[in-house]
Swiss-Prot record:
Gene: kdpA
Any GO MF annotation of the entry: P-type potassium transmembrane transporter activity
Signal sequence region: none
Alphabetical UniProt keywords: Cell membrane, Ion transport, Membrane, Potassium, Potassium transport, Transmembrane, Transmembrane helix, Transport
Topology with respect to the bilayer: Multi-pass membrane protein
Family: Belongs to the KdpA family.
Protein name as catalogued: Potassium-transporting ATPase potassium-binding subunit
Length: 560
């Protein structure tokens, strides 16, 4: 137990050591003129000149939102065309065929929404050109889109006016100043530890038995870096980060975990710098971290305890539940990876979630249902800010004061927009899950009938709604029904909340901040952190508790 505690503590300390200065860097990159402008501004100026972008033109929230949707729609259309003709394009040494229309729709929506749900196997479903031009490109642009939304919200809370910035400038800066430099660093580290980086699509090797085997290769390291830094999650190979070419070593495992965790963990500190009150950032970070550690403890204990039926059958169960796990990672690092990838809504996996114990599988489900414990790049911060505003609103009602957040009144207009985003999340999980469980098109995909089958279906839609992308991969989901239904859920889960929170940002930026008084409810204290924790926990529990009882909890009770 001590070695597990020491491993986790070291990784947590590394996270804080990375996240705090990274938060300051993000603040300088987006909000402040500094020394980095001398290096990056000339590069950005070339991009602005070639694309005709007027980067200094401020936008209202409507203009900002329109620009975001247009850019995303254009990228989606280009990507759809690429996958439909990939067979005829170069860098296709494996002769990969064109994608079927509904699978193409699901795939391009998945990567555009930062979900990376994969109803295909990476090494056989995409050519190297598609992996580079489509997958890697989308991983940058979808992560940058999320960062722009967080940037716009932070800007709205830290200034007074009618505008929230320039989308194109924020989008370019997110790529040039943040994602590209970090990706280069992580790529070099991964290559150093043995992750392949080559244009060779296939390689024939001799096996230990004297036979030959063809191995799939490609530019894996460069994809892996942005896959995790951008909280994307889509794997170059079907086995994702369980594959030895994606994640060959415990060191690469730690690098990948910290990569997908660092930007979501840094954004609260960026927010603290922007509002000139670093305590604000620490309160948000601490609240999310406590929620995360609680969930991690549950999944680790569940997996270490193993399946009770194994012990009852006379077999040794002291090694815990190693089904679906890599021996090189073991239960501790597999459990931590599971918690991080669903907390940060990345979706990459170093073990098979379908093989988790019932309670172990409940944890990634719960983290995606909450969708605000760090969350994805940008959007996770927006989600926790949404809950922070709800907490302030409820606290204000209880003491009979007009709720205020950073001196700005939270009024019915903002709450209506927040509630739309809040209620949509469970709706697009529970409604399609019910439809799938009531129809043959849905139930025919279930590989484990019974309570686990319910969990498989609910997990698929929860992962889609939270823009996570992981799955209980026993589900046979490459059908028209699953491709279209999850595609629609991914679109709604991504863009409705983005539009709603940009509207909230547009409303708040125009309000005159109210001076702080002795009666002001402060949001930079431990008291507010406790209230925020309770708000997240209670709303999540009340919303999803019934379906969790029907799935993982009921399954657990059957094997006790």
């Amino acid at each position: 137990m001590w070695h597990v505690f020491s491993q986790y503590t070291l990784i947590f300390l590394l996270l804080i050591v990375i996240a705090v200065p990274l938060g300051k860097y993000l603040y300088v990159a987006f909000f402040e003129k500094g020394k980095i402008d001398r290096f990056f501004s000339p590069i950005e100026a070339v991009i602005y000149r070639l694309s005709g972008i007027r980067s200094l033109e401020e936008m209202t929230w409507k203009s900002y939102c329109t620009a975001l949707l247009i850019v995303n729609a254009a990228l989606l259309g280009i990507s759809y065309g690429l996958l439909r003709i990939q067979h005829y394009l170069p860098l296709n040494g494996a002769k990969v065929e064109n994608m079927e229309p509904t699978l193409t729709f699901n795939t391009v929506v998945s990567f555009m929404t930062n979900t990376n749900l994969q109803h295909y196997s990476g090494e056989s479903g995409l050519s190297i050109l598609s992996q580079m031009l489509f997958v890697t490109m989308m991983m940058f642009t979808s992560a940058a889109t999320g960062l722009t939304v967080a940037t716009a919200l932070i800007r709205a809370l830290s200034k007074k006016g009618k505008t929230i910035g320039n989308f194109y400038q924020d989008f370019v800066r997110a790529n040039v100043r943040v994602l590209l430099p970090l990706s280069v660093i992580v790529t070099i580290l991964l290559v150093a530890f043995g992750v392949p980086q080559t244009f060779l699509a296939r390689m024939a090797v001799s096996t230990l038995e004297g036979g030959t085997q063809t191995l799939a290769l490609g530019p894996v390291a460069s994809l892996e870096s942005i896959k995790h830094l951008g909280t994307n999650g889509g794997g170059f190979f079907g086995a994702n980060s369980s594959h030895p070419f994606e994640n060959p070593h415990p060191f690469t495992n730690v690098i990948e975990m910290l990569s997908m965790w660092c930007i979501p963990a840094a954004l609260p500190f960026t927010y603290g710098h922007a509002v000139k009150n670093r305590k604000q950032g620490w309160v948000l970070f601490a609240t999310m971290f406590v929620l995360f550690v609680m969930m991690l403890g549950v999944v680790y204990n569940a997996e270490q305890s193993g399946n009770p039926l194994v012990g009852k059958s006379g077999f040794a169960a002291d090694q815990g539940n190693m089904e679906g796990k890599e021996v090189r990672f073991g239960i501790p690092l597999s459990s931590l990876f599971t918690a991080i990838t669903t907390a940060a809504t990345t979706g990459s996996v170093n073990n098979m979630h379908d093989s988790l114990t019932p309670i172990g599988g409940l944890v990634p489900l719960a983290l995606m249902m909450l969708n605000n414990v760090f969350g994805g790049d940008g959007v996770g911060f927006v989600n926790i800010m949404m809950y922070a505003m709800i907490a302030v609103f409820l606290s204000g009602l209880m003491v009979g004061r007009t709720p205020e957040f950073l001196g700005r009144k939270i009024e019915p207009k903002e709450m209506k927009l927040i509630v739309i985003a809040l209620l949509l999340h469970p709706l697009i999980i529970l409604a399609p899950s019910a439809i799938a469980l009531m129809t043959h098109m849905g139930t025919e995909a279930i590989s484990n009938p019974g309570f686990h089958g319910i969990s498989q279906v609910v997990y698929e839609y929860t992962s889609s709604a939270a823009n996570n992308g992981s799955g209980f991969e026993g589900l046979k989901d490459n059908t028209a029904f699953w491709n279209i239904s999850t595609g629609v859920v991914m679109l709604l889960g991504r863009y409705v909340s983005i539009i709603a929170m940009l509207a909230v940002a547009g409303s708040l930026v125009g309000k005159q901040p109210v001076p702080e008084t002795i009666g002001t409810f402060r949001t930079d204290t431990a008291t507010f952190g406790v209230i925020l924790f309770g708000t997240v926990f209670i709303i999540g529990a009340l919303t999803f508790f019934p379906v969790l009882i029907l799935g993982p909890v009921a399954e657990y009770l059957t094997i006790r």
